[in-house]
Amino acid sequence: MTKSTVLSSYKLFAFIFIFRLANSFAIETFFQADEFFQALEPAHHFVYGYGYLTWEWKQQLRSAIHPLIYVLGYKLVGDNTTLVCISPKVINALIAAIGEYNLYKFIIVYDSEKLAWITLMLSLFNPFNWYVITRSFSNNLEMVFTVLALRFWPWNKKINGRWYISLGFGFVSCIIRPTNILIWIPLGIWLLISIRITLKWVALSFLEVVLILLINTALDYYFYQKLTFPLYNFLEFNVFKNLSIFYGTAPWHFYIFQAIPLMLMLYLPLMIYGLKKNILLLTGLFYIIGFSLIQHKEFRFIYPIHPILLYFTARGYVKFKPKFVLIGILLNICIGLFFTNVHERGVIDLTKYLATQQTPSVGFITPCHSTPWQSYFHNPNLDTNSWFLACEPPLHLNKPSMEEIRHYRDQSDQFYDAPESFLQTHLGKDLPKTEQLVVFEPLEPLMNDYLGREYYECQRFYNSFFHWDSRRDGDIIVYCRN
């Protein structure tokens, strides 16, 4: 590699990083609770000693790799509230830039530099990426490690040092999310039938996996302060006990007719047009079929194959008329701006408002985890005198049936089953009467009728024109105590 090539690579990475840094700071909306409660809250709790730990972290289901990245950021910025909010945004931009830079490098190795440039540009202007890639989801980190592994994968069917780099990145992606193994099963079979297997190769690969497992165990021990094996705990909860269905089920075709169209938006026709029968197509199909068999489904669960979808989109792009593609890209930009700056912005506006007001206590009468917590507030007092409705799963059940799951009611369910009765039973008792209460617009009549003498509306934020969860429709409202 020449000096000019290295310089060009640095410039490209710097451009992508600056682009994603702007993207990260431009996001003013809420997507899903895991962005805050499965990475930032555990990291905040680890560094500062307070923050909300969901049951997954109490049960040690998650690898420490993801939150430890944010631990580094928090340790660097110290106790400054503004920097506590900013540091994850910078880290997320860096993670995204690493992913997209290596997507470009992967396509050069797999196909051509021309297609690599097109894939990168399509990735940068993809609205789902603009909406998701700089958020603190473990699926994003999983996707980045997947792309890194694909970049170094032995596509030329020759085993050398690149294989061991690929194996390392691929195995870490499976540690972060064990279901990522669905990508490596077809690729692994393809490799095994394409190369000459030697004892040295098997032994060195095995030793590398063992070494990574030992390092990961040490990281988990450091984070949890006890010897634990999150990979086993994850399998016990999701497979052996089958408790993941508590968080909802979706039809088998969810990923085909909902997730992929959402992830690609107006790129979808290009992706279909660019499909080619090869190992990447087989890998993508195997991954989607595997995830379709799992009852609990979410859009971001198939995010690790998004780079593969973009590769096929790029193939479709080179066959299509550029002017129509340009119109699609411009419309995609509008869609991305709507979801990052308009839809569900009230939740973030509310959190910023409460943080700047230094409210002494607040109660959230909302579906569980509807707002960020200490990763935005950074206020130890709120941990002791504030609350929100919880939604712990039925950990006492072992392989529950759908009927048992339907009959189990968490705290949030109990409230929405009978709001007034719940408030009569709990408010002012196990749920203290706080200085402020937060509700979504559908509960406005309840607040006015039942608590109108004690609380008055003191602030209101637009949140959404529509929402998949009717409990979160409309504005989000702050009530202050008289």
From Swiss-Prot:
One of its GO terms (cellular component) is endoplasmic reticulum membrane. Its EC number is 2.4.1.-. GO terms for molecular function: alpha-1,2-mannosyltransferase activity. Its main location: endoplasmic reticulum. Coiled coil: none annotated. GO terms for biological process: GPI anchor biosynthetic process. The keyword Chloroplast does not apply. Pathway: Glycolipid biosynthesis; glycosylphosphatidylinositol-anchor biosynthesis. The chain crosses the membrane at residues 12-32, 114-134, 137-155, 175-195, 199-219, 252-272, 274-294, 324-344. Glycans are attached at residues 80, 242. InterPro entries: GPI_mannosylTrfase. It is found in: Endoplasmic reticulum membrane. Pfam families: Glyco_transf_22. It comes from the Eukaryota. It is a multi-pass membrane protein. Keywords: Endoplasmic reticulum, Glycoprotein, Glycosyltransferase, GPI-anchor biosynthesis, Membrane, Transferase, Transmembrane, Transmembrane helix. Belongs to the glycosyltransferase 22 family. PIGB subfamily. Mannosyltransferase involved in glycosylphosphatidylinositol-anchor biosynthesis. Transfers the third mannose to Man2-GlcN-acyl-PI during GPI precursor assembly. This is GPI mannosyltransferase 3. It comes from Candida albicans (strain SC5314 / ATCC MYA-2876) (Yeast).
